[in-house]
Every structure is written in C-alpha cells, then in structure tokens.
C-alpha cells in the first residue's frame, strides 16, 4: 500500500513536470479534460478511471488539434498517451490520432448566450455574453467542455450620442388664429432609443399661451361690447326722430281732425 502511494505521488509529480513543458494551448486542453472527471464518473486525478473511458483520450486529441494545430498537437497527444500508460491503461488507434481508419471523433464548438450582470468595460456596458462549448462526439457518446466565452459590448446609456432631436409643438386654434408653442422635444440616441424630454420652459410656455389667449379673448370681448354699444347708440339716435315724427304726425292728425270738426260746426250753423 505504501509502495502504491509512493508510485502515485511520483507519477503525479512527473505529470505536472511534463504538463508545464507543453504549449499553453495543450495545457488548457489537458486541464479542461481533467476537470471533466465528474462527467466521466471519476474522482479528480484518478488516471485509471479517466483513461478507461476512450472519450477522455478523444477529448485530448480533438482539443489539441483544434486549439494547437495538427503539428503542435503531437506533444499534447503524446502526453495523454503517457499519462494513461503510467496508470496502466494503453491507448491506441484513433484516440492517439495514429490510426484514422477507426474514424475520428467530431468536435463541435457552439456558443450559448448566458445572462449578463451589466458589467461595463470603460465606457462600454456588456450587452450579452456567450459561452463557447466544445462537444466531442464519438459514436453515441458526447463530452462537452466550456473552452471560452465572448462578450458583446455597446456604449453605455450615459455615453450615448444623440442622432437627431425634434421639437414637440402644441398648436391651439382660436377662431382663425393659431398659436404654435414648443412644449418639449424628443431625442433619438444611438443606443438608448427614443427618449422624450419635456423642456424646462414648457410650463411657462403654456402659461404664456393661456395669457395670450385670454388677452385676445378680452380684446375680442371689449371690441364686441364697444360695437354693440355703438350700434345701440345709433339705433337710439335713429329711434328718436321716428318717435318725434310719429308724435308730430299724431299731432298733425289731431290738428286736422279739430279743423274738420270746426268746419263741420260752422257749416251746421249756416244751415
């Protein structure tokens, strides 16, 4: 038992030493595959368990080919073979990339949008962040590995620049007169969209408009009153002669009647 522990410790130290000699892309592939131990039903650093699943070796092979290129992938694949051989598990065929006749596994990289907390980079804010997941498919088995992420940034709301600004005009019509007044404005920003912002003088503009309308109405009312008064005066002036004439006519009729009566009486006396 003691011998086994010493051997395991020596193997772990050797593996660490060899891993550091690999290119950065290869170290990432090995680290990612080792981190998938729970996916393979293994505990961390259980080489025998990991290497017993051929998908572990396929993952190292395909990841190194995709990340490092075919030429630089050789040392990474060799590391995987040595790693499993030291644990007593031999690898051969397509897992090592030596025998393509067995059919290579298929590596698929997909991006999946994930929620963003709105963190900003300088004056930019994150719009969406996507994870890049590598799926290694061999037969009916699929192994997924998150190999990175990408974030799309856009200008923060506070740093948006206005594209165009248009006034909001209110028009009040009184009779044949119209009173246009700017009561606000609407601004289209590059990111924030359409933001409607009332002007600070909107209230005073409306008050001024109301006063103007009231003043115009007062002038119209005063003019109308003056016109009515003038018309009444003219009618009164015109009515007085008529009344006098009527009165005079009545008087004339009365005078004529009296003359006729006197003439009739005079005629009666003669008769």
UniProtKB/Swiss-Prot annotation:
Disulfide bonds join 25-68, 29-63, 42-49, 51-84. Its main location: membrane. Induction: Induced during infection of poplar leaves, with highest expression observed four days post inoculation. Residues 1-17 form the signal peptide. Keywords: Cell membrane, Disulfide bond, Glycoprotein, GPI-anchor, Heme, Host cell membrane, Host membrane, Host nucleus, Iron, Lipoprotein, Membrane, Metal-binding, Secreted, Signal, Virulence. Belongs to the RBT5 family. It comes from Marssonina brunnea f. sp. multigermtubi (strain MB_m1) (Marssonina leaf spot fungus). It is found in: Cell membrane; Secreted; Host nucleus; Host cell membrane. PROSITE patterns: CFEM. One of its GO terms (molecular function) is metal ion binding. GO terms for biological process: biological process involved in interaction with host. Appears to function during host infection, and may play a role in suppressing the host immune response. It is a lipid-anchor; GPI-anchor. Residues 18-111 form the CFEM domain. A lipid is attached at residue 247 (GPI-anchor amidated serine). This is Effector CFEM6.
